[in-house]
Curated annotation (Swiss-Prot):
Signal peptide region: 1-28
Classification of source organism: Bacteria, Bacillati, Actinomycetota, Actinomycetes, Mycobacteriales
Keyword Kinase: no
Protein's UniProt name: Lipoprotein LpqB
Disulfide bonds: none
């Protein structure tokens, strides 16, 4: 290990959930360097999965043959043909590989019975997820156990009895499958929203797979909250090719891509822009480069782009764009709001810069409005907290009071503020743009409050379609759904930071498909979590002093507050130079970083 880098051994509850450069083996935990960059759990294999899976090795002992079978099961091509080679002919014909796909780690193969030509083994493992149709990863936690029997046929062991469905070893799964996002539209049609999927196959098959999934539409939980311009009978005519019509190495390297759609209804220029944005960002973020030549029934999809589109043509809907670069970093310092620059801090004009009793605050996406939770100073049983709302450089008004109010969070269009009050009620504060008048309406959060007693954090994603929450120290993601009557609900909450090991203290959105979580642990206090719960990566802990009590993030930078200062972590720094740096003016004082959102 290089100087200046120490290893932190993960607790048993976290091992297998937080993984960096070194994979967790089936028998133990990995040692994590503090200053390494986040890595995917596993190395993406760009080759076709089938090319790396061999036929059963001759003379293999039954327990080793089972491990080879699990490895082969990660190749789904031809109805898991690679795995069927390990079965007896009769069982191969009956095996229902499509029944389920269970993802496990720490697989133990334990002998049950053994004779000269028969053997039965108990398979025990930690269950970490399910892979559902359409490549949907569902994070789960629990134990897995099943029995598999083998018999000797022609001098070779083959599986003679096994459960329906496939068992996927996590490390092998992550070597074979790739996580890619489909992009749908937010309700207002202002940005694209990710829907992560896990796909398998060579890179030259990727475009066809992703466009097919995009046409099939969003997952059921997300469907009420997004739009899909590729629905209603849209299909692809003929093969997807390179931009010049070549059919080899499509989506690999340069040369662009050409897709001819059928069934596209009449569209105005704006609808065509949205349609193209879905296609382009889905392909671009899967490392399939343009130009993107889009056709409809053999003719240019949009006459403005006969030679193809580029990401610049749909840049306004870039899912990785951030407003924080223009608004800048702010902080809550000793109860007051300050603007932060490279040279220091400056109190902002108006109420928010002069008040000394604020506990948390949030800036609107455009930086023009502020919402803050202030200490009322009144003794119990009077409300201890007040939600204050006002313009950035102006006064503020109290819109509601409560015993406890979470850090506010702004809707993307700056029209509403969300917060949880007293741990079990979620509200929206609506603000009229012209008059500044406010009204408070409840959000249907029954699906969330059923998960636990107390909501301590609520953060809306920058596209406004998801909400990240901490409930009783656990991390959940819910879908923000507008109901037919106009009211809002938090629906389909799912635990995503399974195996976190310590209670979550704070969280924020880094990208539209990644959140950053501060947890109550000294060894690895900050982690990144994928929205589908498929991965959890440790961020460096060098220079941090636990506990980390607050986190705010953008697509380029994470900010945290520990027990003595505010620190920043630049995602663009080289791996060897990536560590937390103190923010000038926010050292040795009680301060919390604040970015728009």
């Amino acid at each position: 290990m290089t100087p200046g880098r120490r290893s932190a051994l993960l607790s048993r509850s976290v091992c297998g959930a937080i993984v960096l450069a070194v994979l967790v083996t089936v028998s133990g935990c990995a040692s994590l360097p503090d200053s390494s960059t986040p890595q995917a759990i596993g190395t993406i294999n760009r080759d076709s999965p089938g090319s790396s899976v061999a036929a059963p090795a001759p003379g293999r002992e039954p327990d080793l043959l089972l491990r080879d079978f699990f490895k082969a099961s990660t190749d789904p091509s031809n109805r898991h043909l690679a795995a069927r080679q390990f079965l007896t002919p009769g069982v191969s014909g009956r095996w229902d590989d499509a029944a389920s796909a269970t993802i496990v780690d720490k697989v133990d193969v334990l002998p049950e019975t053994r004779s000269a030509d028969q053997a039965t083994y108990t398979i025990r493992a930690n269950k970490v997820g399910q892979l559902e149709p359409g490549g949907l990863y569902v994070a789960e936690e629990g134990s897995f156990e099943t029995k598999i029997s083998l018999e000797l046929q022609g001098g070779e062991w083959r599986i003679s009895e096994l459960p329906a469905g496939v068992i996927l070893d996590r490390a092998q799964f992550l070597n074979t499958y790739q996580r890619k996002s489909l992009y749908f539209l937010d309700p207002a049609g202002t940005t694209v929203v990710p829907d992560p999927r896990w796909v398998s196959g060579a890179q030259d098959q990727m475009a066809s797979q992703l466009i097919g999934l995009l046409i099939d539409g969003p997952k059921a939980a997300l469907a009420p909250a997004v739009r899909n311009e590729l629905g209603d009978g849209v299909s692809v005519r003929g093969p997807i090719t390179k931009a010049d019509g070549r059919t080899a190495q499509v989506g690999v390297g340069l040369g662009g891509i050409r897709i001819d759609f059928a069934g596209v209804p009449p569209m105005d220029a704006q609808a065509k822009q949205l349609f193209a944005a879905q296609v382009i960002w889905t392909l671009a973020n899967a490392e399939i480069s343009g130009p993107y030549v889009l056709l409809a029934d053999g003719e240019p999809f949009d006459e403005r782009f006969p030679n193809g589109w580029t990401t610049a043509d749909v840049a306004s809907m870039n899912p990785f764009a951030t407003s924080s670069a223009t608004v800048g970093l702010h902080a809550l310092r000793e109860g007051s709001m300050v603007s932060v620059t490279e040279t220091g801090v400056t109190p902002v004009p108006g109420y928010f810069g002069s008040a000394r009793n604020m506990r948390s605050l949030a800036l609107s996406q455009d930086g023009k409005l502020v919402a803050a939770v202030a200490d009322t100073g009144r003794p119990a049983p009077e409300p201890a907290s007040s939600l204050m709302v006002g313009a950035y450089e102006d006064g503020a008004a109290s819109v509601l009071e409560g015993g406890a109010i979470t850090r506010p969070t702004w809707a993307p269009d700056n029209s509403a503020i969300w917060a949880a009050v007293n741990g079990n009620t979620v509200i929206r504060v609506l603000r009229e743009p012209g008059t500044g008048r406010t009204s408070v309406v409840n959000v249907d959060a029954g699906a969330v409050t059923a998960l636990g007693a107390t909501i301590t954090e609520l953060r809306l994603s920058r596209d406004g379609v998801r909400a990240a929450l901490i409930v009783d120290g656990k991390v959940y993601l819910a879908i923000v759904t507008q109901m037919p009557g106009g009211e809002y609900a938090l629906t389909n909450p799912r635990a995503v930071a399974i195996g976190l090991g310590s209670p979550a203290l704070s969280l924020d959105w880094s990208t539209s498909d990644t959140i950053v979580v501060a947890r109550a642990a000294s060894d690895i206090p900050v982690v990144q979590v994928a929205v589908d719960g498929s991965r959890m990566d440790a961020l460096p802990s060098r220079n941090l002093t636990a506990p980390v009590v607050a986190v705010d993030a953008s697509t380029t930078t994470e900010f945290v507050a520990d027990s003595r200062a505010v620190f920043q972590l630049n995602n663009n720094d080289p791996a060897g130079d990536r560590y937390w740096r103190e923010v000038p003016g926010l050292t040795g004082v009680k301060a919390i970083p604040v970015l728009p959102g």
